[in-house]
Amino acid sequence: MSPAPAILALRRVYNFCLLVDEAHGFMALGKSGRGSFEWWQDCGYDCPLQEVDIMTGTMSKSLCCIGGFVSANGVYAAELERQRTLQHQNGAETLSTAVLVRILSLINKPKLIKERMTALGRKASFVADCLAQAGCDILSSYGSPVVCFPVGTIQQASRFHEEAMERGFAVACGVPPATPLWSCRVRVCIFATTSWEDILDLINMIIKVSCKLQLKGITATVFTPDTLPKQYLDDPSIAEQSIKSDASICSYVESLSKTYPGGDLEAKAPLNLAQSQEAVEASVKAFSKYGLGPSSARWFYGTFDVFIALERRLAKLYPSLQRHSGRCRAMLGTDAHTMMLSLLSACANPYTSGVMNILLIPTTASLAVQDGADLNRPRAETKIIYYEKLDNLVAKLRELPIDASKLHLTLYLQTTSHDGSSILDLPATVQMINSGMNDPNQLKGLKLILDDSGGLGKVGPHHLGYLDLMERDHGVSFLNQSLGIKLAPKTEIIVTGSFFNAFGQQGGYIISSASFIEVHTVSSKSFVFSTPPTPIQAALSGKVLEILSRGTC
């Protein structure tokens, strides 16, 4: 736990801006779920939230949703309003209605929150007490719902994870560089809704696995049900408040439907009314089957079949890409803006030893693209070049170092203009690259990022985007023919786009060769650390793509 009392004492002396990130504390710490500062207040310290200038948090970890929030005091509140306006102007996505209703339905129930926070504190403290009694060195703050303890080397951490999974428990491991080489950690997350029976099984599993791996200091101990703390009956006023809160939200939604009537459902281009209804029904079925879905990174919880189905459909969406790249795969993102930022950040990393990676980005690229390219610290092996128009690209290329055998180009291209009036001429662009290089044959490799955010849902015979249009006009060999015999084998093509721009609901995607996607699931920070899309989003996007693939009316 961060030393909030000491930080506030320093702030009162030096008057600095204090930003508190409650990504792990919101609805997880404090008697009313307000985070670490409230946790310290509960412990008797003077930590008023009013002295925090900016606070951030997420909805995923405790509200089982996607999205996050920023709140600010004083002068920073005005800047926050300005940033919000800029976000919308730069195409930031809005949260799905189902997610907003979920959030409102939970935070408007203070009695339920207080009861859950009390239960969470009791369960987390019980786990820590039992493990400490067995000799485990608890590294996390007392009462924290994330219980952390050391297990030794990377090999021991890996074996601990494997043994826990075999017993039906998922644990998170912390390894170098986040931890010392000899002191890897295991983190166990406790939930207020976790049953006491599961809590007991978890404790005994940790001790049993620790003894099997011969972790230092752990003694064989078995905790039985009679060691559990006293249970209390539910307060009936909690259910009463929850019912009233839900009724209020339902009434609000009904009033909106009367204020903005539309025959229940309107057609959403490029779909007709019947097809729009079919897509909505698919998302409703997904909600009935999965709820709002998981609230942690994909690798932690595994995956759902609805995600796999959408990824497989995307991977086979463009025959020309398969003809060029061989087996393709796809990956999903919660929002296209963050996914694009993370993609450019990953592509801005050094290519390989002794090779300079040159990123060529138009000045008209979105803020996410520019921020992603500039996110990493400057390195000698990477250079970012911004150009105004494709006509200027040749001049930029001719300014590159003469030793082309040690160059790799990463070129970001928008498949359509912002207003949709022009379409990318890929063959001409490739020709410019060839003419701009001193010796194209010495180029180490080329990576083309085709941003189809303005193409999907708008262009092509099936409204499936840029490659859909090119395949109709030039056939499935379009990409290989555009690149040419010499350049095609050493070119990686990445197609990315936005479900938000195409269909009006959150989400983004990346399609490329299987080898690239498998690496990018590790190099993409947005994939590793962000909450996945909801099953509702995946089902809706998948159904719309299915409808478009078979042809619209």
UniProtKB/Swiss-Prot annotation:
Alphabetical keyword list: Endoplasmic reticulum, Glycoprotein, Signal, Transferase
Coiled coil stretches, renumbered: none
GO molecular function: pyridoxal phosphate binding; serine C-palmitoyltransferase activity
GO biological process: ceramide biosynthetic process; fumonisin biosynthetic process; sphingosine biosynthetic process
EC number: 2.3.1.-
UniProt keyword annotation of Endoplasmic reticulum present: yes
Database matches in InterPro entries: Aminotransferase_I/II_large, AON_synthase_class-II, PyrdxlP-dep_Trfase, PyrdxlP-dep_Trfase_major, PyrdxlP-dep_Trfase_small
Superkingdom per UniProt: Eukaryota
Native source organism of the sequence: Gibberella moniliformis (strain M3125 / FGSC 7600)
Predominant location category: endoplasmic reticulum
Induction behaviour: Expression correlates with fumonisin production. Expression is positively regulated by the fumonisin gene cluster-specific transcription regulator FUM21.
Glycosylation sites: 480
Signal peptide: 1-25
Top enzyme category: transferase
The protein's name in its UniProt record: Aminotransferase FUM8
The gene coding this protein: FUM8
Family of the protein in this entry: Belongs to the class-II pyridoxal-phosphate-dependent aminotransferase family. BioF subfamily.
Stored Gene3D superfamilies: Aspartate Aminotransferase, domain 1 (3.90.1150.10), Type I PLP-dependent aspartate aminotransferase-like (Major domain) (3.40.640.10)
Disrupted-gene phenotype: Impairs the production of fumonisins.
Function: Aminotransferase; part of the gene cluster that mediates the biosynthesis of fumonisins B1 (FB1), B2 (FB2), B3 (FB3), and B4 (FB4), which are carcinogenic mycotoxins.
Compartment annotation: Endoplasmic reticulum
